[in-house]
Amino acid sequence: MPIIETRDLRKSFRSVVRGEGLGGAVGALFSRRYEEKVAVENVNFSVEAGEVVGYIGPNGAGKSTTIKMLTGILVPTSGTIEVAGLVPYEKRRQNARNIGVVFGQRSQLYWDLPLRESFELLRAIYRVPRDRFRENLAHFVEILDLERFMATPVRQLSLGERMRGDFAAALLHDPKIVYLDEPTIGLDVVAKEAIRAFIADINKRLGTTVILTTHDLADVERLCRRIILIDEGTVIYDGRLERLRDEYGTHRTLVVHLKDPQPDFALPGVDVEHGEPPMVMLRFDRRTTTAEALIRRVTERYAITDVAIVEPEMEDIVRRIYLEGYQKPPARATEA
C-alpha cells in the first residue's frame, strides 16, 4: 500500500478583479468579480514507503502548492490525498507527527536559542521519549558534525551550519516521510555533499520516505531513482530517472585525443568541434550510431591516444522538456 497517494488533485485560488484607480477599488466593495488561478490540476501519483522521489518543475509549476497540501497546510479544491493513511488537512496534528519538513529558505529552529536548546524544545513539542531523543541526536551530531556549534545561538550560525541543524531538527521525532524543499540552496560544494550523504543515510538506515523538490538537479541525480516532472500544475512525467535520460539524452559527445594535431579533421555525418589540439569532440546521436562504431571509424583514419564519452547533462534534458513538453521519442536504431 502506498504511503502517499493523490487522486485527481486540484487546487485553485480566487482573487478579486479590480478596476484601475480609486473608482475601481471602491466599485469592488459593492460588486465583486473574481478570477480563478489554477495552481495544480488533476495530479495523480503514489509513493511507496522508502522511496526517494524528485518532484521537480520550473518556478510556478505547482511544486510548493502540492507540498503544502501534502503537509496539511492547504486544503485541495477537489481530489483526494492520503499520507500514511491520513487525510493531511483533516488530521493535521497526527500528520505532523508522521512528517518532517526542511525548507532551504526558512528555518524551524528558534532564532535566539542555542542549537541544543532548540532540539530540546522540539523534543518536548513532539513528545519524543528521552532515550530515543538522545540516540537520534547522538547519531545526527556525529554524521552532520554538529558538536562544535551546539551551544551557538541559531542566529549566529552560518547558512551551512543552520541547514545541518534544520535536518537534525526535522528528523528527531523519527518521521516516516520527509519533505525537502531546496535543501542545498546557497550551500558550498562540501556542505552540499554532506547534506546529500545524510539524506542517503537516513533513507537507507531508517527507510524514511523522501520527497525532494529542488532546482539543483545534481541533488536529484545523486539521490533519486524516480522523478515526477510537473509543469503548469500538471504532471508531465512520472518514472525512473534513467528512462528519462534514455529517451531524451540521445546526443552524446565522443572526446578523442589524437596522436598528432589534425586541423583538417573531418568525419562525414558527424558534428566535429575542435578543442585544444590534438583534441577533437564528436557529437553524435546514439539512435543512429554507437560510440563503438564511431571509434572504429576514427581509428581507421587517425592515430589516437585516448577517448572518452560525455553523457548529456540532466539539466539540459529537463530544460528541453520544459521548453518542448514531454513526448516519448521513437525507438532508436543503431549501427552494427
Regions found by a protein language model. Name each.
Residues 253-324:
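Short, charged/small-residue-rich alpha-helical element at the C-terminal edge
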Residues 178-182:
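Catalytic Walker B motif of ABC-type/P-loop ATPase nucleotide-binding domains
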Residues 153-157:
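Conserved ABC ATPase signature
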Residues 9, 21-29, 120, 124, ...:
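Conserved ABC ATPase "signature" region
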Residues 196-285:
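ABC transporter nucleotide-binding domain
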